C-alpha cells in the first residue's frame, strides 16, 4: 500500500516540478533553498575538495535547460558498504550515532515531527574561532586527499586514525578498487567461517537538483561483490529502517534510464539547512552557499549510515 501511495505522490510531484518556475533569486539564507546556479557553485566546490565526485550529463534527451549540459548532476562510484543496517541496530556504533544526533534521532526527527530542534546537533562539529574565521569539521562524500588543504594536517578528528589504518584513505583515485574489497571479503571468510564473512557491497551515489523543492536530492544504486545489481529489498537493508519507504523511496533518476533507484526525498532538506544556517549565525559565523553540499552529505548520513562515503575533512572559511 505504501508503494502505491509513493507512486501516486511521485507522479503528482513530477507534474508539480514541471510547472514550478526556476528559482532565479537567492533565498539560501532566508529559507535554505538554492538556485540552479548556486547548486552548480556548491557542486564545483565539492568536486574541488573531493575528487571522487565528478559532474555528469546523463541522457541528452533528459537534459535540464536550467543547468549546464555538462553539469546536470554529481556522481561518485563504488562507495563501499561493509555491513547491513540491522547489524548496527544494537551496536555501540549506532548508540554513538544516536547520541551525536541529540538522543532523539536527530535528522530522523525532522521527518516525523513538526519541528527541527534535533538538527542543532547535526552541526555540533562546527566551531567558531572568531566571527571572521570558521573552522568546520565536515564529513564529505568519499573525499580523496587533496594537496591544497594545508589546514587538513592540523587537529584531525578522533576517527581519522581509524580510516588511515583501514587503508581507505590511501588512494587518490576517483573510484575505489572493488576487487580488493572482494578479496578482503574472501580472506575474512576463510579465516573465520560463515560468521566472519564481510558482505561488501558498493554503491553509486548521485546528487541532482530538485526544481520543485529547490534543493539537492540524493540517489543511490547498489551492487554486490560481483558487481551485480542489488534488488530493491537488498538496497533497503543498507538504509535506516526509520526512513525506508518514507524518506527513501524507489523512483526513476531524472537524467538516466532505468532501473529505478533509491532516492532520499528532499521535502525537509531546506528546513534542515535553514536551521543549520541559524545555528552557525548564532555562533557569530556565516555559512556560505558553496558549502551546501558538504553539509548536505553530512546530514543525509543518518539515512544511509553503513555506506562509507564519510571521510572526515577540515575546511576553513
Curated annotation (Swiss-Prot):
Principal localisation: cytoplasm
Positions of short motif Membrane-curvature-sensing motif: 4-19
BP GO annotations: autophagosome assembly; autophagy; autophagy of mitochondrion; glycophagy; mitochondrial fragmentation involved in apoptotic process; nucleophagy; protein transport
Spans annotated as Disordered: 137-165
GO cellular component: cytosol; phagophore assembly site
Enzyme class: transferase
Active site: 267 (glycyl thioester intermediate)
Acidic residues: bias regions: 147-165
Subunit organization: Homdimer. Interacts with ATG7; this interaction forms an E1-E2 complex that is essential for the transfer of GABARAP thioester from ATG7 to ATG3 and disrupts interaction with the E3 enzyme complex. Interacts with ATG12; this interaction is ATG7-dependent, essential for phosphatidylethanolamine (PE)-conjugated ATG8-like proteins formation and also mediates the autoconjugation of ATG12 on ATG3. Interacts with the E3 enzyme complex composed of 4 sets of ATG12-ATG5 and ATG16L1 (400 kDa); this interaction disrupts interaction with ATG7 and promotes ATG8-like proteins lipidation.
Entry similarity comment: Belongs to the ATG3 family.
Domain notes: The N-terminal region works in concert with its geometry-selective amphipathic helix (AH) to promote LC3-PE conjugation activity only on the target membrane.
UniProt function note: E2 conjugating enzyme that catalyzes the covalent conjugation of the C-terminal Gly of ATG8-like proteins (GABARAP, GABARAPL1, GABARAPL2 or MAP1LC3A) to the amino group of phosphatidylethanolamine (PE)-containing lipids in the membrane resulting in membrane-bound ATG8-like proteins which is one of the key steps in the development of autophagic isolation membranes during autophagosome formation. Cycles back and forth between binding to ATG7 for loading with the ATG8-like proteins and binding to E3 enzyme, composed of ATG12, ATG5 and ATG16L1 to promote ATG8-like proteins lipidation.
Name by which UniProt lists this protein: Ubiquitin-like-conjugating enzyme ATG3
Organism: Danio rerio (Zebrafish)
Amino acid at each position: 500500500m505504501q508503494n502505491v501511495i509513493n507512486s501516486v505522490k511521485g507522479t503528482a510531484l513530477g507534474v508539480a516540478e514541471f510547472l514550478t518556475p526556476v528559482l532565479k533569486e537567492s533565498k539560501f539564507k532566508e529559507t535554505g533553498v538554492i538556485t540552479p546556479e548556486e547548486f552548480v557553485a556548491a557542486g564545483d566546490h565539492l568536486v574541488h575538495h573531493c575528487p571522487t565526485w565528478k559532474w555528469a550529463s546523463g541522457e541528452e534527451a533528459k537534459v535540464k535547460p536550467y543547468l549546464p549540459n555538462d553539469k546536470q548532476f554529481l556522481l561518485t562510484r563504488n562507495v563501499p558498504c561493509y555491513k547491513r543496517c540491522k547489524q548496527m541496530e544494537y551496536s555501540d556504533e549506532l548508540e554513538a550515532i544516536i547520541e551525536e544526533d541529540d538522543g532523539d534521532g536527530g535528522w530522523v526527527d525532522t521527518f516525523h515531527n513538526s519541528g527541527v530542534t534535533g538538527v542543532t546537533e547535526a552541526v555540533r562539529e562546527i566551531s567558531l574561532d572568531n566571527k571572521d574565521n570558521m573552522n568546520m569539521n565536515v564529513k564529505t562524500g568519499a573525499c580523496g586527499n587533496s594537496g591544497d588543504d594545508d589546514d587538513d594536517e592540523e587537529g584531525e578528528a578522533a576517527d581519522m586514525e581509524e580510516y588511515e589504518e583501514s587503508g581507505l584513505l590511501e588512494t587518490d583515485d576517483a573510484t575505489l578498487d572493488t576487487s580488493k574489497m572482494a578479496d578482503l571479503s574472501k580472506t575474512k571468510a576463510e579465516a573465520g567461517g560463515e560468521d566472519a564473512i564481510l558482505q561488501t557491497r558498493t554503491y553509486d551515489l548521485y546528487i541532482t537538483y530538485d526544481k520543485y523543492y529547490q534543493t539537492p536530492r540524493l540517489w543511490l544504486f547498489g551492487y554486490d561483490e560481483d558487481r551485480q545489481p542489488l534488488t530493491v529489498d537488498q538496497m533497503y537493508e543498507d538504509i535506516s529502517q526509520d526512513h525506508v519507504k518514507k524518506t527513501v523511496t524507489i523512483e526513476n533518476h531524472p537524467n538516466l534510464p532505468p532501473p529505478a533507484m533509491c532516492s532520499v526525498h528532499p521535502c525537509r532538506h531546506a528546513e534542515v539547512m535553514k536551521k543549520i544556517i541559524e545555528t552557525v549565525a548564532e555562533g557569530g559565523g556565516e555559512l556560505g552557499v558553496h558549502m551546501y553540499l558538504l553539509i548536505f552529505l553530512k546530514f543525509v548520513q543518518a539515512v544511509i549510515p553503513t555506506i562509507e562515503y564519510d571521510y572526515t575533512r577540515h575546511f576553513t572559511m
